[in-house]
From Swiss-Prot:
Originating organism: Pseudomonas fluorescens (strain Pf0-1)
Protein name: tRNA-specific 2-thiouridylase MnmA
Disulfide bonds: 108-204
GO CC field: cytoplasm
UniProt-listed Enzyme Commission number(s): 2.8.1.13
Region (Interaction with tRNA): 154-156, 316-317
GO MF, one example: ATP binding
Site description Interaction with tRNA, residues in chain: 133, 348
Primary location recorded for the protein, binned into one broad class: cytoplasm
Length: 374
């Protein structure tokens, strides 16, 4: 079953967010097949730097245009770089400056794709927008629910949890009912230019650059000490912002006497002392948390939290659903997990589910230590 198409689809004008990737390309094609009046829109959300780094935006625009030409639809372009800088990138920098690890894709969806793009599309006369996200929607009892995508390997509801039901109600997700290989097969069948194009990975405005090189353009590095849980200094870091909880690579620790062969992991970031706390072993007790505190909660639809709720949650993308109890506190929300969770990271998002329904989520403020810690 695909996104329900109303009987008068020919009267419905849909503008598809065309990224230059295969998912949005096939989304536009499927909507044409369903009888909608379809147009595309390519968003430029970042002004590339003046320098040697090459931004892929021009390639993506060319691919989007090639697909639109092939399937016979108009392609609009819009520049949301100012909105992106103000509403996404400045927050991204502020979070890293505060020693946290943000997820700009979630803010981008809320502020750009389902706000700036949605408003722009409506200004162009659209009835609906569409994107190539692997999620589904369901209209029930006067509200619109956000559901997980049918392909568990590609489900993107984690990234859309902060988008409200009113925005979801104005959006179609044509590939949400499909698995990725099916989408590729459709693109190849119709000989779309994006059929074999690799999926984009990483943060859009960084591209192929090293993350540390990009970040130091905007934030001054503050080197400090690397310490063990016992307080022994075993190295120096270039800045807490370059490290995240659970990180193994790039610590520059090695050859320590009596340290053994187990790899080192980031366990804590002490902002007061600018120290990076590390320990050995993939299952070091300090890596685990029994609960978390969250703020900046966004619900797709209002929910009743007058009593604690039994739900499932994800503390990172593609994590399997984790059983928890969610309750409202005086300062935010607290989720207590049935099983200890590894590498719960402040600044990242926790997203709550009721079965296949994505309820919403928020920003992790505090990871409460597991009682198994020494």
């Amino acid at each position: 079953m695909r996104d329900p198409a109303p009987s008068d689809t020919s009267k419905k004008r849909v503008i598809v967010g065309m990224s230059g990737g295969v998912d949005s390309s096939v989304s536009a094609l499927l909507l044409i097949e369903q009888g909608y009046e379809v147009e595309g829109l390519f968003m430029k959300n970042w002004e590339e730097d003046d320098g040697t780094e090459y931004c892929t935006a021009m390639d993506d625009l060319a691919d989007a245009q090639a697909v639109c030409d092939k399937i016979g639809i108009k392609l609009h372009t819009a520049n949301f770089a100012a909105e992106y800088w103000d509403n996404v990138f400045e927050h991204f920098l502020a979070e890293y400056k505060a020693g946290r690890t943000p997820n700009p894709d979630i803010l981008c969806n809320r502020e750009i794709k389902f706000k700036a793009f949605l408003d722009y599309a409506m200004m162009l006369g659209a009835d609906l927008i569409a994107t190539g996200h692997y999620v589904r929607r369901r209209d029930i009892d006067g509200r619109t629910e956000l559901l997980k995508g049918l392909d568990p390997n590609k489900d993107q509801s984690y990234f859309l949890h902060a988008v409200g039901g009113e925005q979801i109600a104005k959006t179609l997700f044509p590939v949400g009912e499909l698995e990725k290989p099916e989408v590729r097969a459709i693109a190849e069948k119709y000989e779309l230019a994006t059929a074999k194009k690799k999926d984009s990975t990483g943060i859009c405005f960084i591209g192929e650059r090293r993350f540390s090189d990009f970040l130091k353009q905007y934030l001054p590095a503050q080197p400090g000490e690397i310490k063990t849980t016992e307080g022994e200094v075993i190295g120096r870091h270039h800045g807490l912002m370059y490290h995240t909880i659970g990180q193994r690579q790039g610590l520059g620790i090695g050859g320590l006497k009596d340290a053994g062969d187990e790899p080192w992991y980031v366990l804590r970031k002490d902002l007061d002392t600018n120290e990076l706390i590390v320990g050995q072993g993939n299952n070091h007790p300090w890596l685990f948390s029994s609960a978390l505190l969250a703020s900046e909660i966004y619900w797709v639809n209002p929910i009743d939290l007058s009593q604690p709720l039994r739900l499932t949650a994800k503390v990172r993308y593609r994590q399997s659903d984790q059983a928890c109890t969610l309750e409202k506190t005086d300062t935010g929300y607290r989720a207590v997990f049935d099983e200890p969770q590894r590498a719960v990271t402040p600044g990242q998002s926790v997203v709550f589910y009721d079965g296949e329904i994505c309820l919403g989520g928020g920003v992790i403020e505090v990871a409460e230590p597991w009682s198994g810690q020494a």
